[in-house]
Amino acid sequence: MCSQSQFGNQGEGSGSPLRTAIRILDEGNHDFCYEGEMNIDTALDPDLRARLFPDNRMEGPANVLVFAHADAASGVRNILKMKGGGLEVGPILMGMGNRAHVVSPSITARGLLNMAAIAGTPVAQYG
C-alpha cells in the first residue's frame, strides 16, 4: 500500500484509506503477503524496509503497488512504464460485480493480447 506516510506516521492524507484497507485485509484469511502504507522506495527496497520496519510482513520487493488515489497510481505507472523496461498489463478495475479491463488508444498489439488473455482467464473466486 503506497502512501506519503510510513505505517501511520501521518494521520491524514492517503494513509487513512489505506489503513482502512489493511484493517479489512487483516480480518480475512489471505494466501498473499501485504503490508501497511509506506513510501514507494520502502515498498520496492527490502533492505530499506528492513531497516525502517524490522517487523514488517514482506520479504523481497513489492510486486504489486496499491494507491489510494488514481492520479498517484497513474503517475507512477507511467514512470515505471517508461523507465522500468517492464511489461505493463492493465489497468484492471475490480469491485463492480465483475472485472473491467481498460485500455488506452495507444495500447500496443501485445498489450491488447495480454489484456485479452487476462479477460479470458476464469476467476476462481471473486468478491
Task: Identify the meaning behind each predicted range.
Residues P46-R49, K81-G85:
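Short amphipathic alpha-helical surface micro-motifs
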Residues Q4-V64:
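Active-site rim loops that border cofactor/substrate pockets in soluble metabolic enzymes
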Residues N63-K83:
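C-terminal hydrophobic structural anchor segments
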Residues G36, A68, S104:
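Pocket-edge structural micro-motifs
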